[in-house]
Amino acid sequence: MSDINIYLAGCISDVSASLPFLSDYMDKRRNTRIFIFSHLRTASHLLFRIMESHPSLTTKQYPFMEAFLFGPERLSVRRTDSLDDFFANDGGKFAGHTFQKCLDDMETLIKDIESEGKYVMLKEHTVHLITSRVHEANIEEKRPFRPTPVLQDHCLDLDEAQRVDAMRTTTALPIPNPTILPDRLLKTLTPVFIIRHPALVFPSYLRASKIFGATAFDDDAPFYMTLKWQRLLLDFYKTWYSCPEGAKSAGPGREHFPIVIDADKLINDSHGQIDKLCRLLGLDPAPIRFTWEAQDRSGNRAQAAFLTTISNSTGVIKSKGSKLPVLEDEAREWAKEWDVETVQAMKSRTEDAMEDYEYMLKHSI
């Protein structure tokens, strides 16, 4: 049970040629608030590991995860023996991890980083940011409902004078905000979505989450074995950038926003994908490093379950092949690891998620 507690503690020139506007674009756009909207098991740790090597970036992962999973307002409803034991013995460690505190802390962090003249890069799994009502409206299965708390935007990312003006000024969004983040703050973020084929995502999720007692049939499976949340937020940002205020905020090259990165493109063409991303963000890609020191997580089973590959690596580990997975072939492999019911559930959820994946893939860089 302590594991859960511990867990919480040459291409460049080709790319430039394919996107000729980018060299000028780098000089015109400065995105100081970059937010990676990820999903579990989409190689988001790889993207983050590469990008955090940039000297202009200060990074923070998962500002809302503990509130979603373990705080007093938690929206995760999975119940297992290991989690019941954890909540009975955590000593109130997460009693103060409310969504409001997470928001205030994130806004304060943004202000502190920007005051140093740096960019902030944040990352959170999109599902952890979607409101309960949006979850409920998009999940067919009946599951316990827990309401999302109403958050106050204290505008802590702004100076005091700006804060007063921001609190007085409200601008209606073109479509409803599906997240817990305040409208004002959501508009200031530069969204980067990282996606991956669901036939790779869902089995990886079940393997890694086994330590928490997760199954394909528990009450949290509808949260995590879908790509709906990323598509919902992607469509929100597409609509935002199509309206005058949003288009102005995007600046030149707004047709490339929101940014979508496919994990397998990132793995197999890391230099090309990162070069495109940096240039779209107004960052010089030259300082980026693609090698790093391995990290020993052998004493932490929970972290190892999710981070073994990236922790043991010293650079990008390319895929064995570039072809998209074939579901029937994948299912035969799953049958060696899981029972018939689980394999069928994964197949069904993969089929359901394919439309969302293919839709988002069309928007990838």
Identify the meaning behind each predicted range:
Residues F94-D105, L173, P222-W229, D269, ...:
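Soluble or luminal CAZymes and related metallo-dependent hydrolases
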Residues S2-K118, E124-H125:
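PAPS-dependent sulfotransferase catalytic core
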Residues A43-H54, I261-P287, R301-G321:
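PAPS/PAP-binding and catalytic site of the sulfotransferase fold
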